[in-house]
């Protein structure tokens, strides 16, 4: 499956637990919605993913990717140290100039 470079980096940096490199996938004003919370800007996003990486040690296995213009959805099998692992989640991206402007994680 062919993925945009930023989505490949998003997956790779999560696999190696590099929260700083993960945050670099996002624009300065990016917004992330996950687990009922909103995270605004690179600094908050880096703190969110650092906590998530430490708590869940999750890995993503891409199952499907659909794109329409700047909007796309990655469906992935997510495994890690959390109840119900593995689960299938959808990552709804809005990509702008090769960086993620908006991400919403849903089941």
Language model features by range: what are they?
Residues 5-8, 20-21:
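Core segments of small alpha/beta cavity-forming domains
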Residues 16-29:
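Short, well-ordered alpha-helical segments enriched in acidic and aromatic residues
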Residues 49-90:
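Surface-exposed, charged secondary-structure patches
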Residues 32, 65-67, 105:
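Hydrophobic/anchoring residues in structured secondary elements
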Residues 31-40:
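A short gly/proline-enriched turn/hairpin at secondary-structure junctions
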């Amino acid at each position: 499956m062919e993925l945009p470079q930023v989505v490949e980096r998003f997956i790779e940096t999560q696999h190696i637990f590099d929260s700083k490199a993960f945050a670099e996938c996002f624009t300065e004003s990016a917004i992330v919605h996950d687990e009922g919370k909103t995270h605004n800007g690179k600094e908050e996003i880096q703190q969110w993913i650092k906590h998530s990486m430490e708590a869940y040690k999750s890995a993503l296995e891409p199952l499907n990717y659909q794109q329409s213009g700047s909007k796309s959805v990655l469906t992935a099998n997510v495994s890690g140290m959390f109840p119900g692992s593995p689960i299938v989640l959808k990552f709804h991206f809005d990509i702008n100039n090769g960086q993620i402007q908006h991400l919403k994680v849903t089941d």
